Amino acid sequence: MLIIPAIDLKDGACVRLRQGRMEDSTVFSDDPVSMAAKWVEGGCRRLHLVDLNGAFEGQPVNGEVVTAIAKRYPNLPIQIGGGIRTLETIEHYVRAGVSYVIIGTKAVKEPEFVTEACKAFPGKVIVGLDAKDGFVATDGWAEVSSVQATDLAKRFEADGVSAIVYTDIAKDGMMQGCNVEATAALAAASKIPVIASGGIHNLGDIEKLLLARSPGIIGAITGRAIYEGTLDVAEAQAFCDSFKG
């Protein structure tokens, strides 16, 4: 299982939100490229970037920062989400060296767009499912739909989606533990690999994910915990690599 540091971009800075609220953000760095360097030097094998402004505005806003990080680390798999609503945006990011694009809101509102994107950019598309009580939320979590996360995941199986990033909104940024049960249930319900996100606080939370013994869970995204020092990226990755259960 991969430990994937998150860099959330707002107005060019690296921030963390609580439960997706833009008004409840903490700035951790004014230099996201240097922050990326810190996690790379700490041994991370993939980076998770989110354009928060883009998620709310429906188009990339912090694209230059994303491109700068991708150019600095051409051999590092990078995934980007937030404001990806057109094939042109995907092409821009892929050309910039980004490994994966995460389609969130549009995947819920127009599932056929995921099919198109997977055909145009095979192996490059991740679907981001952000859920509240099992129902998928959209538009920067401002709206909660009537669509179940497990149902939507099954819908994308035939498209060739590389992974699903599953976030439990109630847990995100709160550092109260990941929703292991819901994450494992999603991994069991779908053939698409799942990346857990939201709420990871320490090594104990990583262990709980591993103890779920779900081969479908391939990674865990962590944000506030690594910024506030309750989780060490290198230590957590080493723990995953050596885990025997």
Curated annotation (Swiss-Prot):
CDD domains xref list: HisA
MF GO annotations: 1-(5-phosphoribosyl)-5-[(5-phosphoribosylamino)methylideneamino]imidazole-4-carboxamide isomerase activity
UniProt cross-references to Pfam families, sorted A to Z: His_biosynth
EC number: 5.3.1.16
Record's keyword annotation contains Amino-acid biosynthesis: yes
Listed pathway(s): Amino-acid biosynthesis; L-histidine biosynthesis; L-histidine from 5-phospho-alpha-D-ribose 1-diphosphate: step 4/9
Active site: D8, D130
Keyword Isomerase listed: yes
Subcellular localization: Cytoplasm
Main subcellular location: cytoplasm
Catalysed reaction equations from the record: 1-(5-phospho-beta-D-ribosyl)-5-[(5-phospho-beta-D-ribosylamino)methylideneamino]imidazole-4-carboxamide = 5-[(5-phospho-1-deoxy-D-ribulos-1-ylimino)methylamino]-1-(5-phospho-beta-D-ribosyl)imidazole-4-carboxamide
Keywords assigned by UniProt, alphabetized: Amino-acid biosynthesis, Cytoplasm, Histidine biosynthesis, Isomerase
EC main group: isomerase
GO cellular component terms listed in the entry, alphabetical order: cytoplasm
InterPro entries assigned to the protein according to its UniProt record, in alphabetical order: Aldolase_TIM, His_biosynth, HisA_bact_arch, Isoase_HisA-like, Isoase_HisA-like_bact, RibuloseP-bd_barrel
BP GO terms, sorted: L-histidine biosynthetic process; L-tryptophan biosynthetic process
Family listed: Belongs to the HisA/HisF family.
Protein name: 1-(5-phosphoribosyl)-5-[(5-phosphoribosylamino)methylideneamino] imidazole-4-carboxamide isomerase
